[in-house]
């Protein structure tokens, strides 16, 4: 947005006045330096007065390590890129500005510019060693720089706004997973602020982190309005799970014990299951959803210790229920005589180092990652 307190991305051209050599690269200019460099943060064409003509600066996402090492050995300035004094904040009541020495790592791009004996054309700009990756801002960052005051309906740069961005991303991912769900804001920003989000969905990043991977582990189902799903697990096989209430899955060893391992970690297989309970107490005025501080009336909770497993298929988990599976055990839950609400629970020993199943990953034909479920011991 125009006037936002953040940097922008620009194409930089530097000229050696002696040799007339030029250097080109895409880099970052912090918002505190715009006036100094004669840059006016103006709105983009046909965008009204809100959207800036410049792409917003975020972070360095991809970097060639070899080039960075070579740059650091050739110039000590590269070790402290983008040095500046930020005098934008008043530190005393009389308005006295306080100085903050900053080092913006985005400006490491300044050390990776392309040398040219003459002026480059616009066509050449596409072949620079630095580039900008465009995506939705909320995919990369959502800053919470101020506390929302009572009655304030603006979500920009507040914890409430950042949490909504998180849920908007979750909504996009759930659609990729073919899971029906309500709108994250429950229909409007006003309803979101007054009664909470339309749903809450959170997963451990180790489940992917790529959405393409997550969409192969979570396939089909639905989240009813005001439902909650929290999946602190990496090894999950979810298929056609319908949640109306709260479903909480927690592993003590999400990625193994001590070291990264997809063997010595908890895993859950949940297929054709209905979760039905009262879930979150949405009427509780003390709920603070963005900080995960809220009360529940009921929930279906699963805790997996160590390499424990749970296997649920063709069942309905109704009301307040909890399953805690110890290390080295597998809990199998099935319906009895076709009655989804009448359940049988069977504990089995896990062969050390041999889980029931695991995901096998391989690159596909389009450099995508394909994951196949491999049954090891059933």
Explain the meaning of each model-derived region.
Residues 2-378:
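Left-handed beta-helix
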